[in-house]
Amino acid sequence: MTTGSALYIPPYKADDQDVVVELNNRFGAEAFTAQPTRTGMPVLWVARAKLVEVLTFLRNLPKPYVMLYDLHGVDERLRTKRQGLPSGADFTVFYHLMSLERNSDVMIKVALSESDLSLPTVTSIWPNANWYEREVWDMYGIDFKGHPHLSRIMMPPTWEGHPLRKDFPARATEFDPFSLNLAKQQLEEEAARFRPEDWGMKRSGANEDYMFLNLGPNHPSAHGAFRIILQLDGEEIVDCVPDIGYHHRGAEKMAERQSWHSFIPYTDRIDYLGGVMNNLPYVLSVEKLAGIKVPEKVDVIRIMMAEFFRITSHLLFLGTYIQDVGAMTPVFFTFTDRQKAYTVIEAITGFRLHPAWYRIGGVAHDLPRGWEKLVKDFVEWLPKRLDEYTKAALQNSILKGRTIGVAQYNTKEALEWGVTGAGLRSTGCDFDLRKARPYSGYENFEFEVPLAANGDAYDRCMVRVEEMRQSVKIIDQCLRNMPEGPYKADHPLTTPPPKERTLQHIETLITHFLQVSWGPVMPANESFQMIEATKGINSYYLTSDGGTMSYRTRIRTPSFAHLQQIPSVIKGSMVADLIAYLGSIDFVMADVDR
């Protein structure tokens, strides 16, 4: 199920300076200040007055930066290691742009004074800037002039303050005890009421009144605590407003009070179906800060376990997706089949859903005795099982009728909205980070990138089914070619250090005690790592101030971008089509809300 892509993806160019030359030629070198980082891309500071002009230039280049991959902020006021920061930078807003035709990224930063926290919106350049700008305002109080609807997105409408500011409390014990009297309850209920006029919607058309329907936040087809308000003309969706934030737990704030080591279990709970796949971009980014090169065996173990979790996540997607369009039986089979994968995962890591098993510099422990047979049995069994699903369910005429041609979009639209993963590849765009920008040794494995052509709900499902087959191929190669060697790097910042040395050397024992109890001290710098996760591209952008905890942890998840795209895709469709579309996205709200 592979097809040719009209878009050629060249070899990855880390820290590509070509765009810097183009920017200097157009605006002059004095317009930019380069910041050296370990992010693997050019990082350029620009004045606020030039921001929109620079971003428009990058969007319209012959090989354009078509995707606004990420947009967020940093409160710089308590940062002590300020090399590379402009003077007076109390707050930073960064724009991470991606070009597929160049296969390279660039980051544009703007420094803001605490007394003047405003920027022009860039929603006219990239439509997906809408939610990102809302979140920056919600978390930092930075105003975006000209934004179509600048309002809370993660926090409740009645919330006071901006949680990611450094002067905002980080623990519940720093707040007054929670209480809910009748007056406050009524206030919260009224604040949650949807008012069409606030969103530029009419209550009636030329010949009829519209109905406004709350789908969620606890509807089974919403796949979590997610509300989407539908403006309906009969069964037809005239417009809709997704409402997120019900599952927000402040993961990025938590990272500021956990050590580099102790934050690993928190990553498991971002995409809570992704298991160790969540650990991978985080530990890779920390290892960039630390300058750690892990042994080959660590890379292969990490890849093998990440692909196991890709399979378990996709199996759950498959069962619930088929259930969403009306077939009840397959979900029971997919859950039973996931158990076979979890038997292997539990034998290797000791846990099932949330192993928190990767470590800075390696993995928690070596592979156990007998792991080979468990893995071998699984890779021999699953492909035949996928054949059964394809015959029994995916070729079913009812499922095809509910999903083929439904919620369809093309590559251009996908890139404009920041869509990645199977949602992008279902449009025919051959962009998979494991091939396009290999990490952890993926370049040493033979596998294909499943593609489709129509970009509809059916194709998104079929791409994921084929991805499971490719994951089995990768796991099989790990089984056959597992290297010998240590499961941790020999590096001072490997956390915890190799256990056997702590029993022989007092210095290593002291290091073990300090790194586990206090935390390893990472060099002051910024690092970044993206991976091809279960639901699309997931990344961690880390800022170290030379301490035992992260100064700023930015977690970019694929599902946030995917839900923002919903209104542009589903207008004019039926409510039943929306249910099929939501299922085909494959999201969990923890991945959206963090």
Curated annotation (Swiss-Prot):
Keyword vocabulary terms for this entry = Cell inner membrane, Cell membrane, Membrane, Multifunctional enzyme, NAD, Quinone, Translocase, Transport, Ubiquinone
Q: What is its main location?
A: membrane
Q: Which stretches of sequence are listed as region NADH dehydrogenase I subunit C?
A: 1-185
Q: Which terms in the Gene Ontology molecular function aspect does this entry carry?
A: NAD binding; NADH dehydrogenase (ubiquinone) activity; NADH:ubiquinone reductase (non-electrogenic) activity; quinone binding
InterPro entries hit by this protein: NADH_DH_suC, NADH_DH_suCD, NADH_Q_OxRdtase_suD, NADH_quin_OxRdtase_su_C/D-like, NADH_UbQ_OxRdtase_30kDa_su, NADH_UbQ_OxRdtase_49kDa_CS, NDH1_su_D/H, NiFe-Hase_large
Q: By its UniProt entry, which SUPFAM superfamilies does this protein fall under? A: HydB/Nqo4-like, Nqo5-like
User: Would you tell me the Gene Ontology cellular component terms?
Assistant: NADH dehydrogenase complex; plasma membrane
Major enzyme class: translocase
The record describes its membrane topology as: Peripheral membrane protein
Gene3D superfamilies given in the database record: Cytochrome-c3 Hydrogenase, chain B (1.10.645.10), NADH:ubiquinone oxidoreductase, 30kDa subunit (3.30.460.80)
User: Subunit notes for this chain?
Assistant: NDH-1 is composed of 13 different subunits. Subunits NuoB, CD, E, F, and G constitute the peripheral sector of the complex.
Q: Which family does it belong to?
A: In the N-terminal section; belongs to the complex I 30 kDa subunit family.
What the protein does comes down to: NDH-1 shuttles electrons from NADH, via FMN and iron-sulfur (Fe-S) centers, to quinones in the respiratory chain. The immediate electron acceptor for the enzyme in this species is believed to be ubiquinone. Couples the redox reaction to proton translocation (for every two electrons transferred, four hydrogen ions are translocated across the cytoplasmic membrane), and thus conserves the redox energy in a proton gradient.
Q: What is this protein called?
A: NADH-quinone oxidoreductase subunit C/D
Q: Which organism is it from?
A: Pseudomonas fluorescens (strain Pf0-1)
Q: What is the lineage of its organism?
A: Bacteria, Pseudomonadati, Pseudomonadota, Gammaproteobacteria, Pseudomonadales
